[in-house]
Amino acid sequence: VLCCEGNGGYPEIGTPWVPLERGYSVLGWNHPGFGESTGLPFPEKEQNAVEACFLFAVHRLHFQPSQIFVLGWSIGGYTASWIAMNYPDIAGLSKKLSVFSNYFKNEVLDATFDNIDELSRRVAPSIFDPVLESVVKMYLDLNNLSHVINYDGPVLIIRRSDDEVISTGDDHSRATNRGNHLLIGLLKHRYVKAYNSCSIK
């Protein structure tokens, strides 16, 4: 299991413990600039870092891609979904595995978002929206939905209640959770006929 941490996590104390306790081999890594890692955590650097770990698992540890699950938590969903999109023969993708080892047969998305645009608007007054939009598109275009719709494996989406990080409302309600948009975007892509024949809200 290749583990991709969230913004506040480290592989020494974070997501690797869940698959490790269930008997899986685990490979964890730090975001560039986190822990003992050098660099800056921009999208291209993040992609390079996770790809280096994935290729290490394949070429040095001799795992087949079909034996590798990728686990991403929160913002780690970006790198996890990027690997799934670029290496679709992986065994599965997980975004924040909780206590569900049986779901390692699926792509599991937990505590993540569709893209970072709306979330970035939460942190600044609306007068800065044009600047934020430009900066996000240019430097921090974390679009998980664009990755997930380019991965054809099975997907299980887990949405947390009262998630203050990926909700856009002040009350952190499930209705404003950006995981909803990830699910709807995926359904629109995979089930076009069903989506056109009924309303998904």
Give the ranges of each region predicted by the language model.
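Active-site loop/turn elements of alpha/beta-hydrolase fold enzymes
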Residues: H31, L109-T112, R160
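Short, surface-exposed "cap/lid" segments of acyl-processing enzymes
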Residues: V1-G23, N30, F34-E36
